[in-house]
Amino acid sequence: MFPELNSLLGVTTDTLTLGKFTLLCDSNTDGSFLVHHFLSYYLRAGCRVCFVALVQSFSHYNIVAQKLGVNLSSAKDEGQLVFLEGLKSYTDLLFGDKSEAEETNPLCFLRAGSDLRPLYSFVSAALAPSAGQPWKCPVLILDDLSVLLSLGVTSLQVLDFMHYCRATVCTQYKGNVLCLVHGAEESGDEENELVLRSLSHQSHLILQAEGLSTGFCKDVHGQLKIIRGAVSSGKRGKNQPEIYQYKIQDKHVAFFARGLSAAVL
């Protein structure tokens, strides 16, 4: 995890806020560093995490996590992490036994053209409380919802799925939900824009990574907008975002106020 980001958000691994939905989004840049941060943060905090990875392989996430001081393989073996590797599930769905895939694959809705109930069932079962488990609150992380739209899932199906996930994980299980959605400029379609806008109004916290309007800079890789309390305030349009610029390094992300990078000073 990135300590500077924790400081900006006012959180530690000892103080967890429960029942919250966090929306991660990016525009003209790659916001995946936010996903890696929260994955390592919640594992370090001792939470049980269900990670739905629709973009990269398990080995990719594990390599990045090890740089951040977390071993995903150990977390899986200990039962702390439930990892759905979307790329492998796609392959099994396309080239595996059809009847078996439809029975056990959480992504079988892609072949059947049905709703996302199999994926929801997988998530709810993975995070269901059980007696004697040592983990703290359950956490669902999805990387990323835009992939489902590109595979033919409708915006209504995605929003229904997220509604049930939030109702189950946030309200019933007293846990947290995070998801990444690409900005509308990146995808260029109305379905993605509808999902992004709808989830923005439903979220408790929004982290939006943006590319610089001035173009590439080796010392400043982008800016991060932090919008708090989008749900609880009831005044989503009046919330003033906190804006920081950042530079991504190998094992660290440095944050600073706009115009105050080391290169400028």
From Swiss-Prot:
Pathway noted in the entry: tRNA modification; 5-methoxycarbonylmethyl-2-thiouridine-tRNA biosynthesis
Keyword Amino-acid biosynthesis: no
Gene: elp6
InterPro entries: ELP6, P-loop_NTPase
One CC-aspect GO term: elongator holoenzyme complex
Domain of life of the source: Eukaryota
Task of the protein: Component of the elongator complex which is required for multiple tRNA modifications, including mcm5U (5-methoxycarbonylmethyl uridine), mcm5s2U (5-methoxycarbonylmethyl-2-thiouridine), and ncm5U (5-carbamoylmethyl uridine). The elongator complex catalyzes formation of carboxymethyluridine in the wobble base at position 34 in tRNAs.
Record-annotated membrane-spanning stretches: none
Protein name as catalogued: Elongator complex protein 6
Subunit structure, as described in the record: Component of the elongator complex.
Family: Belongs to the ELP6 family.
A Pfam family per the record: ELP6
Subcellular location: Cytoplasm; Nucleus
Protein keywords: Cytoplasm, Nucleus, tRNA processing
GO biological process: positive regulation of cell migration; tRNA wobble uridine modification
